Regions:
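Tandem repeat domain/solenoid detector
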Residues: 16-20, 33-36, 72-76, 88-92, ...
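Conserved core positions of repeat-based scaffolds
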Residues: 27-30, 39, 58, 83-86, ...
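Short glycine-/Asp-/Thr-/Trp-enriched loop segments that recur within the blades
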Residues: 11-16, 67-72, 115-116, 131-139, ...
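Signature of short aromatic-glycine-proline-rich micro-motifs recurring in repeat-based ectodomains
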Residues: 18, 23-26, 74, 79-82, ...
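Short loop/turn segments immediately following the C-termini of beta-strands
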Residues: 26, 33, 42-44, 82, ...
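Short loop/turn positions that demarcate and connect the beta-strands within blades
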Residues: 15, 53-56, 71, 79, ...
Length: 198
């Protein structure tokens, strides 16, 4: 096999102006210079973010508001196993795809509007899990990272937040309990978490 250039959505030219890519299990995300997000591959759990579960071998633009608007002003993306997270310029985090373990960070496992589904087909804004927060949503985020079935975010103050599957303690909160909303990781003398360039 040899590498091939990714075609554009119409299949007649190539996807251009890409500044970042991230690969999930069977899907790929690309962030364009204009702040839009494009996805292709398997879409069983809505990981393409286009309000369908139909896979695509060509890039499709990620939408919000049940597919009516494009996800824009994105500065960073990260693909998990079958879910994705995106960081917007305003410091908010958006997530879509599989939510079986609460890895979308929207406050519930599964789909908040249809309990028969375990996924969200378009991005939803990540909520805050902090009891003392005056905000409903996670804010002032500067970096994100998706694990296979969990996610992390770093805010401007240096706080790390985690959410999703926690079967082996990957959320860093001294439990093995999953979290469907971001919780702040506590630092201390015995342990520290660092999220950034090395």
């Amino acid at each position: 096999y040899s590498p091939v250039q990714v075609k554009s959505a119409d299949g007649n030219s190539y996807l251009t102006d890409i500044i970042f890519v991230s690969a999930g299990s069977n899907h790929t995300l690309a962030l364009r210079k204009d702040g839009t997000v494009w996805a292709w591959g398997l879409n069983t759990y809505g990981q393409l973010g286009n309000n369908t579960t139909t896979g695509s071998s060509l890039p499709v633009q990620v939408k919000i508001a049940n597919g009516d608007l494009n996800l824009t002003n994105v500065v960073s993306i990260s693909a998990g196993y079958q879910h994705n997270i995106a960081l917007r310029k305003d410091g908010t985090v958006w997530a879509w795809g599989d939510n079986s373990y609460g890895q979308l960070g929207i406050g519930v496992k599964g789909n908040p509007t249809d309990s028969s589904k375990t996924s969200c087909l378009t991005p939803m804004q990540v909520v805050t899990g902090e009891q003392d927060s005056s905000s409903t949503y996670l804010e002032d985020i500067i970096q994100i990272s998706a694990g296979p079935t969990f996610a992390m975010a770093l805010d401007r103050k240096g706080n790390v937040y985690t959410w999703g599957l926690n079967n082996v303690g990957q959320l860093g909160n001294n439990t093995n309990t999953d979290s469907n909303a971001p919780v702040r990781v506590s630092g201390g003398l015995a342990y520290t978490v660092y999220l950034g360039d090395v």
